[in-house]
Amino acid sequence: MITKNEALDFLKLNSINSILEKLEGINTQNSSKTITFSKNAFIPVCNWCRNVCGYCTFRNENFKLLKMDEMKEILTKANAFGCREALFTFGENVDENEKVKEELKKMGYYGILEYLYEISAWCLENTNLLPHTNCGILSYDELEYLREVNASMGLMLENSSARLCSTIAHEKSPGKDPNLRIEMIENAGKLKIPFTTGILIGIGETLEERIDSIFEIKRIHEKYGHIQEVIVQNFRSKPLIPMENYKEPSPIEMFKMIILSKLILEGISIQVPPNLNRETGQLFLMAGIDDWGGVSPLTKDFVNPEAPWPDIEELNSFSKELGFELKERLPVYEKYISKEWLDKKVLEKIKK
């Protein structure tokens, strides 16, 4: 077990030998030498959001709300491509936008969650894809409602420090209050929803705040046992965002955070997005990641549209180069495929 003080000392190290010593413990954890990925389709249901984060390009005041037929067409194509995950994403509290609400009303829906539920249920009934929803803060009741049609759900913690709410990253983003995000992650645990969360590196946080965030995820998981994977995501600068000139975290910063995450979060998969780390992905594989996350042969990453997915053959090639076997997985990890963790209709779909 590593303490917070030991973790901080490790992040401050500039000795390659001392850093590599920590890898000995990592290498014994993934003795199977496998790295997983999920073949998915990214469905950006609506790109309006109440949050205006300093690093984001997803939000658009001139929003687009995908029509039901558009989503069904994407899902049908994804099914033909052999995808098994339908990633449904939209901005937080889109119902706050009267124009979005009016569009939904014209189509016969009282809100975005009813709309999402219907397309998710259609997805389960008509394709081999399993829904995974990531749409910002949801209440306990909303999570319970969506659990019926989701194999797993997700919300990035990003960081557990409230200090960032007064910085350029989150000063215009009420939904990035860490207390709200922690409450939702805990509620997902109470409801036994297999869950994905993660931290965002390079948005103005201190080393101590990075460590506190990982330990907060550990605390929640030890209480509820529902966190199946943790994403260690690096900030990437983009043109025309408020944080355009902010420095990106170095590969060594990421390398050390991955090692720490693997040591602290025992039994939880650690993921790094491969499209944000095409040049450094193999380095992070050496540091202990065991999952590449969702990769789509059909749709782009609408949150990071400037960063195309590597194709699966490319992922396979540089995984094999380090002796790892690339293995496809579902959006719900195998240990959560049971009636304890999944709604009956989702479980029946998987067993078919």
UniProtKB/Swiss-Prot annotation:
Entry cofactors: [4Fe-4S] cluster
Domain Radical SAM core: 35-275
Residues annotated to bind [4Fe-4S] cluster: 49, 53, 56
One Pfam match: Radical_SAM
Enzyme Commission numbers on file: 4.3.1.32
One annotated GO molecular function: 4 iron, 4 sulfur cluster binding
Catalysed reactions, as listed in the record: 5-amino-5-(4-hydroxybenzyl)-6-(D-ribitylimino)-5,6-dihydrouracil + S-adenosyl-L-methionine = 7,8-didemethyl-8-hydroxy-5-deazariboflavin + 5'-deoxyadenosine + L-methionine + NH4(+) + H(+)
Annotated cofactor note: Binds 1 [4Fe-4S] cluster. The cluster is coordinated with 3 cysteines and an exchangeable S-adenosyl-L-methionine.
Domain of life, per lineage: Archaea
Record keywords: 4Fe-4S, Iron, Iron-sulfur, Lyase, Metal-binding, S-adenosyl-L-methionine
InterPro entries in the record: Aldolase_TIM, CofG_family, Elp3/MiaA/NifB-like_rSAM, F420, rSAM
Pathway this chain belongs to: Cofactor biosynthesis; coenzyme F0 biosynthesis
Subunit structure as annotated in this protein's UniProt entry: Consists of two subunits, CofG and CofH.
Free-text function comment from the UniProt entry: Catalyzes the radical-mediated synthesis of 7,8-didemethyl-8-hydroxy-5-deazariboflavin from 5-amino-5-(4-hydroxybenzyl)-6-(D-ribitylimino)-5,6-dihydrouracil.
Annotated family: Belongs to the radical SAM superfamily. CofG family.
NCBIfam families: F420_cofG (TIGR03550), PRK06245.1 (NF004884)
UniProt-recorded name of the protein: 7,8-didemethyl-8-hydroxy-5-deazariboflavin synthase
Taxonomy of the source species: Archaea, Methanobacteriati, Methanobacteriota, Methanomada group, Methanococci
